[in-house]
């Protein structure tokens, strides 16, 4: 055998390199969108050798459909399936090196070529949890800690609106009649009334709580009105007393004359 077959170049050329065996990417007419705040930084925060190696393994492929949008920026910054980061809704395509096969997005299955950052293991990680897309326009996700991401998610989660019960006239009449009898009905009485008016006992209990609060407000306002009326009567009587005295004095003078 010729000695050239055992040269380093021939040996390395025969082995498939993970770096050069990325799945082919469909060409797109539009130029890919570049995010300046995300470009150049890896998911793990620091920009160095690990960042460049990771970017070499995973170049920015074009999203399926020919829209010209990157499915991953500097690694897997946007490579989470169906999550919003920045102003881009990413449908992550199964891209990856050929030595590992077509790999699903990070979080579902880890590729042996991609190192797992410490503190963010598996699909239960905070980074995999959906963060509202209004919160991360051009934001470096790798610089945020676990606590900061949790606080962002909690602050911007939409609160569920409570369903307000609409009572019929018959139900309101029955509830009001019982309220006139007792302000604090027991559980048995509430259950009996609930069966009568086709309501749940919890709804009856909430109605009585609200009705008692309204009754206390009305009672407080009526007492304040009565107190104000008494004060006004006292002040009006004190102002009218000198006039009455003058009239009484004039009447006394007339009687003397």
UniProtKB/Swiss-Prot annotation:
Keywords: Developmental protein, DNA-binding, Homeobox, Nucleus
Pfam families: Homeodomain (PF00046)
Compartments in which it is found: Nucleus
Signal peptide as annotated in the record: none
Region (Disordered): 213-257
One GO molecular-function entry: RNA polymerase II-specific DNA-binding transcription factor binding
GO BP annotations, alphabetical order: dorsal/ventral neural tube patterning; embryonic skeletal system morphogenesis; forebrain development; middle ear morphogenesis; muscle organ morphogenesis; negative regulation of Wnt signaling pathway; neural crest cell fate specification; regulation of transcription by RNA polymerase II
SUPFAM superfamilies: Homeodomain-like
Gene Ontology, cellular component aspect: nucleus; transcription regulator complex
Disulfide bridge partners, by residue number: none
UniProt biased composition (Basic and acidic residues): 241-257
PROSITE patterns xrefs: HOMEOBOX_1, HOMEOBOX_2
DNA-binding region in chain numbering: 160-219
Top-level lineage group: Eukaryota
Gene3D superfamilies named in the record: Homeodomain-like
Family in the record: Belongs to the paired homeobox family. Bicoid subfamily.
Protein task: Regulates chordin (CHRD). May play a role in spatial programing within discrete embryonic fields or lineage compartments during organogenesis. In concert with NKX3-2, plays a role in defining the structural components of the middle ear; required for the development of the entire tympanic ring. Probably involved in the regulatory networks that define neural crest cell fate specification and determine mesoderm cell lineages in mammals.
Protein name listed in UniProt: Homeobox protein goosecoid
